[in-house]
Amino acid sequence: MDYSYDEDLDELCPVCGDKVSGYHYGLLTCESCKGFFKRTVQNNKHYTCTESQSCKIDKTQRKRCPFCRFQKCLTVGMRLEAVRADRMRGGRNKFGPMYKRDRALKQQKKAQIRANGFKLETGPPVGVPPPPPPPPDYMLPHGLHASEPKGLASGPPAGPLGDFGAPALPMAVPSAHGPLAGYLYPAFPGRAIKSEYPEPYASPPQPGPPYGYPEPFSGGPGVPELILQLLQLEPDEDQVRARIVGCLQEPAKGRPDQPAPFSLLCRMADQTFISIVDWARRCMVFKELEVADQMTLLQNCWSELLVFDHIYRQIQHGKEGSILLVTGQEVELTTVAAQAGSLLHSLVLRAQELVLQLHALQLDRQEFVCLKFLILFSLDVKFLNNHSLVKEAQEKANAALLDYTLCHYPHCGDKFQQLLLCLVEVRALSMQAKEYLYHKHLGNEMPRNNLLIEMLQAKQT
């Protein structure tokens, strides 16, 4: 469905620079790019580029290379899922509220620009110190600033690396069990995953859990019991960071050279996902499900959980000119723009827009843990053996989030609905991220034994 926009915003089509005619397929675009995108998707067209897949797309040359034009449509954020498959006029109605929300945010941003000169793509923060000398086994790519997070030493963490000590992820599990088997299955298959660490997770048993968990949260009045329990399940961020850094500092076997920046990012994402799997295994309801249901749920939402983890880290980071990695290092947006390539750069900027939306909504930690729980128990899942238990978990989480927002943010009566709309954008972002990863995989650019690619392949089989 198309939506009008306000003329005073002076928007130009992000694909070709022509005058915008309205909201089309998730974005303000011109009429020409709207029609081109719709025809391409509905007719399942496949284009090729006769040049180097980097043709300039503007108002005068937009018809010259349909391949690069369509890639630019996807890069700037036009959404495949918004195009109707039945060839009827109008997009999918479910995107209407998101368009209206986006329009309101653009109006708000326009007012901010007029009042404060605020822009998303600001330069690096003033006074950022130069990066310190990197540790010997973990070279920092150019453009990364190694900060000193609280509780994280500059060198490798003291003591054994424990469950995440191996730099290369163990993939020696039966393919029939899927890529998560080594991280989910306890010693005896067919049992639900216990909250304790299973035997395959670490060869020598170690005393105590690998992560420190905070003291029970005293939320005071108006904090539902479910949210209190979820807060207690959140791992200590400093210990997670130290464990991931320690893993990255260990050189991979057979690869004495320093890894490329993209390979490092993939390993960071792998280790972050392993910590997310551990969190899921400790969650109420999830640990009561059969292993098959647990794997189905995680295979459905793994990319959304990773994206949402990144988004919340940026909200805590609070700097528009850089992004914060899970290792505590800062990457300037100017570095991303110069070195990351157009697809990854567009992903980062789209994520930054969502960071701004959630920051404007004043997302707090209580809402974050509840939304993460909702993502884990997404009802957009088929072939579950215990669908009723998952449905009950989602209903309880929805009720807890609604009660919390009404109690603590009474001045923003629709905050609950706005937060759920943001989850739609998280899913769209995760879909674009998976397409990017698979594109890199087809180009043989992904590191070996990458868990994320195995997750992608498991989803397709």
Curated annotation (Swiss-Prot):
Keywords: Acetylation, Activator, DNA-binding, Isopeptide bond, Lipid-binding, Metal-binding, Nucleus, Phosphoprotein, Receptor, Transcription, Transcription regulation, Ubl conjugation, Zinc, Zinc-finger
Chain intervals annotated as zinc finger (NR C4-type): 13-33, 49-73
One biological process term in Gene Ontology: maintenance of protein location in nucleus
Entry's Gene Ontology cellular component terms: cytosol; nucleoplasm; nucleus; RNA polymerase II transcription regulator complex
The protein's name in its UniProt record: Steroidogenic factor 1
Species: Bos taurus (Bovine)
Main location: nucleus
Position(s), cross-link Glycyl lysine isopeptide (Lys-Gly) (interchain with G-Cter in SUMO): K119, K194
Highest taxon in the source lineage: Eukaryota
